Structures are given as structure tokens and as C-alpha cells.
């Protein structure tokens, strides 16, 4: 059983509110869950304290048990200082192709 910490959508049409839940990864997004850890209201301003509420003790306990946070929940935990999110960069993307490299070298010489 693969356990994940993820967001389950609640609220009404055009007014989403998300519950942060622990669930089996095979369960539907808004379906059965094991435990509710908090909530996230994306409609509130980013500086509002009520935008995100998490029970950090429960979150740490589930992470210790091996629960995998979703990408969005990992961002929340990284901002809270609970877990460190690995950077997702592609260093090869910044390397110029041959034509651009030649043009860049010519521009540097001029």
C-alpha cells in the first residue's frame, strides 16, 4: 500500500478549497482517505495565515512512516521548513546549440 499526502478538492464550483489528506495512492483524488492533516484555500491572499493550515506533528509522523508528499504538498512543506524539495532543473537546457554557440563566440570576439 503506497501512502501519499495530497490535496483533495472540496468547496463549490469556481470556489475551490483543498483538504490536505493522507490516502492510499490507488484511492480517487476526492475519495476515501486515511487521515485529514489540514486545509488549503487558494482564494485567500498569499500573506493570509488562514490560506494554509497543517497539523505539523501529524505531517512529520506520516513522513516518518514513509508517506510520499505530492508535488504541491512538498512545496508547502518546503516553505514550512519540514522537508527539503529537490530542485527540478535541466542544466542541459541552458547549453546553447552549435549555431548559437558559434554566434555567441563571434559576438564575444567583436
Swiss-Prot record:
GO cellular component, one term: small ribosomal subunit
Region named Disordered: 84-110
GO terms under biological process: translation
Gene3D superfamilies recorded: 3.30.1320.10
Residue stretches of biased makeup (Basic and acidic residues): 90-103
Single GO MF descriptor: structural constituent of ribosome
Keywords: Ribonucleoprotein, Ribosomal protein
Family annotation (InterPro entries): Ribosomal_bS16 (IPR000307), Ribosomal_bS16_dom_sf (IPR023803)
Family stated for the protein in its record: Belongs to the bacterial ribosomal protein bS16 family.
UniProt-listed PANTHER family: 30S RIBOSOMAL PROTEIN S16, SMALL RIBOSOMAL SUBUNIT PROTEIN BS16M
The protein's name: Small ribosomal subunit protein bS16
Gene expressing this chain: rpsP
Amino acid at each position: 500500500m503506497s501512502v501519499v499526502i495530497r490535496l483533495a478538492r472540496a468547496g463549490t464550483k469556481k470556489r475551490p478549497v483543498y483538504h490536505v489528506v493522507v490516502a492510499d495512492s490507488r484511492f480517487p483524488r476526492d475519495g476515501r482517505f486515511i487521515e485529514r492533516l489540514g486545509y488549503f484555500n487558494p482564494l485567500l491572499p498569499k500573506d493570509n495565515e488562514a490560506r494554509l493550515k497543517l497539523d505539523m506533528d501529524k505531517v512529520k509522523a506520516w513522513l516518518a512512516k514513509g508517506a510520499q508528499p505530492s508535488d504541491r504538498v512538498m512545496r508547502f512543506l518546503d516553505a514550512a521548513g519540514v522537508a527539503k524539495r529537490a530542485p527540478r532543473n535541466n542544466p542541459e537546457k541552458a547549453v546553447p546549440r552549435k549555431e548559437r554557440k558559434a554566434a555567441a563566440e563571434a559576438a564575444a570576439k567583436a
